[in-house]
Amino acid sequence: MAGKHEGSGEKTLYCSFCGKSQHEVRKLIAGPSVFICDECIELCNDIVKDEILDDHSEAQDKLPKPMEIRKTLDDYVIGQDVAKKVLSVAVYNHYKRLEHGGKDNEVELDKSNILLIGPTGSGKTLLAQTLARLLNVPFAMADATTLTEAGYVGEDVENIIQKLLQKCDYDVEKAQTGIVYIDEIDKITRKSENPSITRDVSGEGVQQALLKLIEGTVASVPPQGGRKHPQQEFLQVDTRHILFICGGAFAGLEKSVSARLEKGGMGFNAPLKRRDKEATAAMLMQNLEPEDLVRYGLIPEFVGRLPILALLEELDEEALISILTDPKNALVKQYQKLFALEGVTLEFRTEALRAIAKKALARKTGARGLRSILEQILLDTMYELPSMSGVKKVVVDAAVVESGTKPLLVYDDAAKVDMSHPA
């Protein structure tokens, strides 16, 4: 019963769940012909919180092993075998550290943040995204080039944590076990080895600000994405257990390694000049030292907080062809599905795939440029196809990619073929 009249004629309201009157509780909230008191709300919150903690505990129990992590990465990312192995071990150790961090007071495990070095389009971002999806943890991505020191026009480094909170509906506990990927980290290197009077608001200063987040601090974040002001209550997010993955191309870094090895009399300089890019990348993995990154422009403290290094190789033609067709979410499969929704089969001939890969290599965009090439060659067909009838297959060959001719259209009537395409 929601309420009844007392002697004064005033109607007394009761909680529909526990039966307490409005005089026995601090607050009674009304809904459509139903009431709930603050005590019942608190009880409901406790029940939901316990269920969330149980789910989190269950997820931790199912932490995939390094070989299982690697297998999942293989499903979505082509090549980069060494980087996958490094990432699989680092991520596994990080979440095992979270799981057992408070159970043994004798040895404290340091956080293993990761630095990915590789050219544009080599798979750095995709690797980080795939790891977060596999582990079912919040994932946020930031571009280091947009970050500035606090007080300057630009994006505050603490906005990164705000993005992470947004991905998990401002669940602080969940956000504190998430993964943050910071791209273009090489673009915030110190502009010169000697500090100058001019303020470097997007270089060393940003490294100093990021350093606090990466090594572990309690960040104050405005709730629900609001702007900061003095009277506002902030959400407190502990970043000690957030895994930070930083990525960058670090163009020219091999010159620093080469100069150091030559200076040390190790005789690596001449072979380095003769080797192709793949061999150079392999040599870097074996010989890159923290001092090379410091000489490049990262401050020593920042390098020290990124102890795990994974080097990604530049993708060759064969790797780009595999990226087009092999992964679970391969681009060719995605476009074939789009065409299938129109009841049409999309076919790419082998020479067309090779031509697409060559065009991406020429643009020096790696795998990142593949989608724009596909969109360009299929745009007119995707525009016209919904208004056409009788088409059962679209065939893309090398001429479509290289010369810009239209794809071959095959109709239900086998004799009727689009004659605008050369035989």
Swiss-Prot record:
Name the Pfam families for this protein.
AAA_2, ClpB_D2-small, zf-C4_ClpX
Molecular-function GO term, any one: zinc ion binding
Give binding positions for ATP. P119, T120, G121, S122, G123, K124, T125, L126
The residue ranges of the ClpX-type ZB domain are 3-56
Question: Which keywords annotate this record?
Answer: ATP-binding, Chaperone, Metal-binding, Nucleotide-binding, Zinc
Q: Which residues form a coiled coil?
A: none
One GO-annotated biological process of the protein: cell division
Task: Summarize where Zn(2+) binds, as residue positions.
Answer: C15, C18, C37, C40
Which PROSITE patterns does the protein's record reference? Answer: CLPX_ZB
Q: Which GO terms describe its cellular component?
A: HslUV protease complex
Its assembly, as annotated, is: Component of the ClpX-ClpP complex. Forms a hexameric ring that, in the presence of ATP, binds to fourteen ClpP subunits assembled into a disk-like structure with a central cavity, resembling the structure of eukaryotic proteasomes.
Q: Which family does it belong to?
A: Belongs to the ClpX chaperone family.
Q: Which PANTHER family match?
A: ATP-DEPENDENT CLP PROTEASE ATP-BINDING SUBUNIT CLPX-LIKE, MITOCHONDRIAL, ATP-DEPENDENT CLP PROTEASE ATP-BINDING SUBUNIT CLPX-LIKE, MITOCHONDRIAL-RELATED
HAMAP family given for it? ClpX
This chain's function reads: ATP-dependent specificity component of the Clp protease. It directs the protease to specific substrates. Can perform chaperone functions in the absence of ClpP.
Q: What is the recorded name of this protein?
A: ATP-dependent Clp protease ATP-binding subunit ClpX
Per the UniProt record, the source organism is Acidithiobacillus ferrooxidans (strain ATCC 23270 / DSM 14882 / CIP 104768 / NCIMB 8455) (Ferrobacillus ferrooxidans (strain ATCC 23270))
